[in-house]
Each structure stands twice: as structure tokens, then as C-alpha cells.
Amino acid sequence: MSPPSDLPIAALSREQRLVFPSAADLNRALDLGVFYLKAPDDLNLASARQFGLELISQDSPFRDVPAYGELEGFIALENNQQTKLALRRERWDQHYPRDIAVFGRQLDAVGVAIMREVFHHSGIPEGLWDRASGGYTSGGGDAFLNFVHYDTRTPDWGLRPHTDYGFVTILDASAPGLQIEIDGQFEDVPVLPGHLVINFGEALNFITAHSERTVGAIVHRVLSQRSNDTVRHSIVYFANPNLDGTLWQFDANGEERGSSSVEDLFALLERNLTE
């Protein structure tokens, strides 16, 4: 499959604004719900990648991080090849090395900048951004920092086709395998050195649904990884609303247009991912 040659590329300005080469690139990114982002110069990717690579070793002490419910800890997904160390922001300082916790908070800043840019174009009044995002745009909400690798002993999908649950996903992947669905066809997303892949999720699509600029939630998958493939490991950051909160929809006049519990939306998406 050929790569999406027109996948937009953005960068963050000194003012933490998301900058695209043209309005057409911006609009395509918002429509598709996916784009490349130049990694900020101060983002310590090398250290984070090394940490993720070390998790592949069976004797890594971080494999002993306990499970917290179904979403956190050192866990494996059903019907997928993913094995991962997944932790919410509130547990980063407890379980991650200090430099990795700092790295996670750097991704917090990237996620907030992206969310604020989407809100700028949505027309939703700025005074409602915090409520619409469940507090995420002011440093609250929920966030996961996950280190993922793929168990080639199983013949399943690397990751089955799905959309993400939350607002924004930030991905750093070491090898090919990611594909996105455009016009009913899956296309490769090549690894672009020095860049992260950003995609939008269902919660962001939901809260912008009645605004001046609804954004897409991209369907994507990871191809089944084979034992002779380059070892694929990745860093994945999820910007989410509070998992026990409510999603609110506003229009450009600041009027409430609808709501849904986060729990209900995420439960539906979880069934789609694992069934």
C-alpha cells in the first residue's frame, strides 16, 4: 500500500501555536484527524525510546508494575499483539523514572497546544474550553503515557482497526506498520524521522460536533508484526477527558448542544476494539 503523500506536517511555534504550511494543510489535518508534528527540540525522545526498548527484556523490573484495573500496569491486549506498560498521569512519579515522568509532562504541553489550536478553529468561546475538555486544556483531565511493543509469538493484528477514545494521541514509532483509513482504503503511514504522528479521537470529534469546525477521528490499525520484522516498539500518549466525567458539546454561541458520559463512550469503543 502506498503512503498518504499529502499527509500534513505541522510544527509548534515559540508561542505554542500549531503551524501548518498552508490553510489547505490545516484543513486536511482537521478533516482527516491525523498529521505529522515536528518533534519539539527540547523533547527528550532518545531517553524515552531507550526506556521503551529496555521493557522488551524479560528481566526488566518495570514488567512488575502492578495492574490498576484493566487499563494500567504491564498488560497485554486481547486479540492484538500489543504488550505495554500503561500508566495514567497520577502514577508517573510513582512508577516511571524521573526523566520519563518529565517527558510525559512535556507531552502534556504538546497535547494542550494541539487542543487549544482545535478550539481556536472550532469557534467555541475560549471561556468554555476548560469545561469542554474536562479540564485538559488547563492541565487537568486525564492522560496516559504508554510504552508498547509487539509480541510476534501471536498471529493476531498488531492492533486491530479502531478509532481512539480520547482527544489527542501522540505517537512515536520505531518501525513501519501503522495504517490509516482514507476513503475506505488503508494506507501506510511511514516513519518520518524527527516527527511524531498526531491523531484525533472520538471525544474530540464529539465535543466539536456542533461547532464551526468538527474534526475527524481517524480509523487506524497496526499490521501484524512477524518475528523477522524490525522490532516495533512505540511511545503513545493519550490526552483524555476525566474517565469518570461528562463530555459537553457547545456551539460557536456558547450554547450547550448535548452531552455524554465518558464511561459510556469509552465502553462502546472498547467493545469495538476487542470483539
Language-model regions: role of each:
Residues 52-60, 111-118, 122-126, 201-208, ...:
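A generic secondary-structure signal for well-formed alpha-helical elements
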Residues 148-161:
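Conserved short histidine dyad/triad with adjacent acidic residue
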